[in-house]
Amino acid sequence: METSCFTLLGLLVSLSFFLTLSAQMTGNFNCSGSTSTCQSLVGYSSKNATTLRNIQTLFAVKNLRSILGANNLPLNTSRDQRVNPNQVVRVPIHCSCSNGTGVSNRDIEYTIKKDDILSFVATEIFGGLVTYEKISEVNKIPDPNKIEIGQKFWIPLPCSCDKLNGEDVVHYAHVVKLGSSLGEIAAQFGTDNTTLAQLNGIIGDSQLLADKPLDVPLKACSSSVRKDSLDAPLLLSNNSYVFTANNCVKCTCDALKNWTLSCQSSSEIKPSNWQTCPPFSQCDGALLNASCRQPRDCVYAGYSNQTIFTTASPACPDSAGPDNYASTLSSSFNFVIVLIQCALLCLCLL
């Protein structure tokens, strides 16, 4: 059995080596869930100082308040607010899922300027959030080295709309810094190493590539927004806000408020599509829960072209969860590897 034993050990080493090599960051985010469109986030930074106005223009964000809300900045923040070199700004993007991958909608485009090359556009202009190969692929560019001034290309930023363990999350594209580890990134964003590794198809720090985007799931506040609402799914991460229902409602997400979306009628911004904001309609049914004897609020549940929906808040609020989000995602990939290794070793010992 010595020959068989050495053969099996060789297979074991080869298998482990192959699995390690095959696990690497691709820059693509998996998006295979039932939700085909959603709001996602990217973390943008520039090596040079810039302004919020420039970032808004670059990413084709319709309203500056969308960027302000994603970064929890005051609504009166100027468009010309300076953004320091390497300062990260969270930018909301419209995500679309197709063929198991999520990319930003075609509203983000870039026009080639003098001396531009695709690699420069990807790494410098868009801060490493996308690769030049991906730009070339989706725009069907025959030769990435032959582009002309004035050509306009779609910039396919990575994103996802998938749930995590059945829970809603906000997928955030984080550009990995040189020398970073999964543990550091997990601690920064309130998740765990296993979740980050499995979500991005890697095994550990050795496959973590600097200056490449990593899919980071940010815990989202729970809400009562209906599936047929025009703003569904309304997903916000901690310390962020958004104006919705034609600017008539302001919703905020705060971990200190039990990770529950808080929405109030707002007059801070002029309504769009409606001359005046309709009042929140009255909730039907009793607003006092018999089991926990706590009053139930009438909360925001979405909107249609004609009205704002409301519903009674959940019967009894859950106890406040931890500030960070540590997923219970099972490490099935690692388990399979260990199982195969154990099987080969057992055969070797026979």
From Swiss-Prot:
Domain of life: Eukaryota
Span of domain LysM: 108-155, 172-216
GO CC, alphabetical: mitochondrion; plasma membrane; plasmodesma; side of membrane
GO biological process: defense response
GO molecular-function terms, A-Z: chitin binding
Primary localization: membrane
Signal peptide: 1-23
Cellular compartments annotated: Cell membrane
Residue numbers binding chitin: 114-120, 142-149
Residues carrying lipid (GPI-anchor amidated aspartate): 318
InterPro entries the record matches: LysM_dom, LysM_dom_sf
Annotated CDD domains: LysM (cd00118)
Recorded topology in the membrane: Lipid-anchor; GPI-anchor
Disulphide linkage map: 31-97, 38-161, 95-159, 97-161, 221-253, 248-277
Glycosylation sites: 30, 48, 76, 99, 193, 238, 258, 289, 305
Alphabetized UniProt keyword annotations: Cell membrane, Chitin-binding, Disulfide bond, Glycoprotein, GPI-anchor, Lipoprotein, Membrane, Plant defense, Repeat, Signal
Pfam families referenced in this protein's UniProt entry, alphabetically: LysM (PF01476)
Propeptide: 319-350
Protein role: Chitin elicitor-binding protein involved in the perception of chitin oligosaccharide elicitor.
Subunit: Forms homooligomers. Interacts with CERK1. Binds to chitin oligosaccharide elicitor.
Official protein name in the record: LysM domain-containing GPI-anchored protein 2
Organism, scientific name: Arabidopsis thaliana (Mouse-ear cress)
